[in-house]
Amino acid sequence: MAIKAAYNRRQTISYHVVLAVVLCLLLARPLHAWEVTGYVGMEDLAFIERPLDSRQHMNYVSGVIEAELYHEWDNGSQVFAFVPYFRGAQYDSNRTHFDIRELTWVKAAESWELRLGIREVFWGVTEAVHLVNIINQRDMVENMDGEDKLGQPMINFAFIQDWGTVDLFILPGFREIPFTGVDGRPRPRPPIDVNDAVYDKNGFARQVAYAIRWSHSIGDWDIGLSNFYGTSRDPVILVETDLTGQMLRLIPYYQ
């Protein structure tokens, strides 16, 4: 319990540091020409078959609010973007969540870009499952396909040349995958116990990751090479059983 509480405090501190730095950079500039967009939606997740667990339900109603605050200045060479996201869900408390998808400041020059804050990074490729999108954690309570991502605090420097773009990343603050709770559907049986996640790394090594990527376009071909060092965003699911082999719970193991 003490380890979990310490982890939560470190994660909160990393978000507060990112927020303070971005706001200081923003307030140093005149505030004009702001763009505000967003959407509000309702969803009814319904199932044909009755659940196996009496704690689950046949349908789940939820509401979504997402906004985007966008501002650019200095002839477009500096950009601020803020994208908060909230879903309020019926029955499943794990699916009710708030996330900052983006809170970022960008400074662009002819041969480089500096991006500081909370961001979503997409390394686009052609496969249906984007296996190389390893910067951001998956938001599994939003969609089981893993396409929705959680915002990730980062420092990202891009070196832009004719022979390609090199992106360097420092990623403070590891985020666990949120999974559907015991009342939610769909979910495995037994449900995944996120409160007792196991880690291969501890301390600073667990919290901070690094990545580098080179990308280039040649005609119709997009080429990319990347390397990631840190705690994997994709956990191995461990099975805990009793003496008879009956499954008791599933536990995420982050390597």
Regions of interest found by a model, annotated:
Residues 186-255:
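Surface-exposed beta-loop-beta
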Residues 61-67, 100-103, 151-155, 208-212, ...:
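Hydrophobic, lipid-facing positions within transmembrane beta-strands of outer-membrane proteins
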Residues 16-28:
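Bacterial N-terminal signal peptides
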Residues 1-13:
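N-terminal secretory signal peptides that target proteins for export/translocation
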Residues 70, 74-184, 219:
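Outer membrane beta-barrel
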Residues 54-59, 100-101, 132-137, 176, ...:
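Flexible, surface-exposed loop regions and adjacent strand-edge segments
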Residues 33-49, 80-82:
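Transmembrane beta-strand segments of Gram-negative outer membrane beta-barrel proteins
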